[in-house]
């Protein structure tokens, strides 16, 4: 596990312990029983691709550990509306407070403002967070293979699917991909960022693409900054993308999305 990921996971352990003092897991479980059915996250991506278009997971992210604050004028609801108008299939919302300046409320605000399915982008290591994600309104959760052992991957993905959510399983190298394939989640995200060096290369996706089973949907994540990047990945048969930084730095995030993915 990389140094930054080790720090984040250590913080998450403390965060979960603190949250348990205020809301028990039993209370979250009870709340889950009365919630409406999640919006289909994987289904939305697959429907877009079946229509012949690129499926974009547009990210709502105020800051990152490597780049600092990306967007000072940060209004999740307005960004969500902009993304939906720009052609996004789904949203990703950072809820990590300490490292990404996110907040649980950002997810709720974004989801309430549009009709798109929403990924809770956080560092999920415990069943408590899966129930919490469902209560917040998440339609999908992220599981980072580098942060979890095989038993955790199976248990957390199984719980999310049982609660009606989808799971995006994120990998950074071939060893992690082989582990991700062993669980039944339909979405595999290949992160082009090296967690040790923070260097980004689209070659990560291009090299590993052929190893992803045909019954899984590959999502390329990180380092997609221009329409040329999109064209390069599309030419290689990549049809689903998670993009955040490029949009967050734009004056109009949804227009940036449209220009990058839908104007040739």
Swiss-Prot record:
- Quick one: a GO biological-process term for this protein? L-tryptophan biosynthetic process
The entry's protein name is: Indole-3-glycerol phosphate synthase
Give this protein's Gene Ontology molecular function annotations. indole-3-glycerol-phosphate synthase activity; phosphoribosylanthranilate isomerase activity
Q: Which domain of life is it from?
A: Bacteria
What are the entry keywords?
Answer: Amino-acid biosynthesis, Aromatic amino acid biosynthesis, Decarboxylase, Lyase, Tryptophan biosynthesis
EC number(s) stated in the UniProt entry for this protein: 4.1.1.48
Q: InterPro entries from the xrefs?
A: Aldolase_TIM (IPR013785), Indole-3-glycerol_P_synth (IPR045186), Indole-3-glycerol_P_synth_dom (IPR013798), Indole-3-GlycerolPSynthase_CS (IPR001468), RibuloseP-bd_barrel (IPR011060)
Gene name of the record: trpC
Specify the species: Xylella fastidiosa (strain 9a5c)
